[in-house]
């Protein structure tokens, strides 16, 4: 069933949804318009769904630097144009050349990977009219969804989950393989990225790698990392716990334009109550789903350093 976001934006739907979350009497004729028959869940009201996304972005950075697209209809495919746009000077009165670009599109099939989360809450809180259940659920779901999303957008295999930027086959291009992470290797990575993508380039690494880079100096003793702005070569650094350490065979640093990583939302966040599962604990469970996919649509837009594998 395709969810009509105009319905989930209505105040009456919002009231009935939160009545359902509190196990109160609801108007099924209103609530059923937001029901996903495949999961038995109800789409969150638009305002609450936005709060979930805000909670994700508060804790995790990948959605901030990627391109987020809504594609709620079934059967969607996206097309990424991999060619550079072409312009030519044309003499007065001369024919304008027709540029055939149909073959320059790479077709990227977008799946609907299901991300699930369960949040539990004591019945006393649920029945307390003064307890802000919307704030609690949106923040909890934002944190759990955000953590799973970020890990998948970086390390995902593409099978039953998004394709991460570190995926060997469909992720970012490997710019170089280095025995160790030194000043020259970082400079080589920077200039391996085409100027088109370098202009909006961002560094991605974990805390341990950042600590190593903070200590790197050039031949004149100048630090690679600018502590005043927390930048490397003038470009922002983002830290993620899901980037690997500097170790054999790993890809500890990614650099490039992350807007070419597309996060495609296939269905809005939806929730249903689990009344019986936790009854012995005087709790109510909330099962939530998010359907989405993620892919790097231009492999050359982001490059990585790979640490050479040690021979045993």
Residue map of PLM features:
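Short loop/turn segments at secondary-structure transitions that flank enzyme active sites
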Residues: 82-87, 116, 125, 147, ...
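Alpha-helical scaffold segments that mediate packing/assembly in large oligomeric complexes
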Residues: 98-191, 304-312
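Short, solvent-exposed loop/turn segments at the edges of secondary structure
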Residues: 73, 112-114, 281
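Assembly-associated, polar helix/coil segments characteristic of icosahedral protein shells
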Residues: 1-108
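Short helix/loop capping segments that flank catalytic or ligand/cofactor-binding pockets
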Residues: 80, 86-90, 98, 128-130, ...
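A residue-level signal for conserved active-site and pocket-lining positions in enzyme catalytic cores
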Residues: 78, 141, 286
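Alpha-helix initiation and N-capping motif
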Residues: 14, 49, 59, 75, ...
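Extended oligomerization regions of viral-like shell subunits
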Residues: 157-293, 301-312
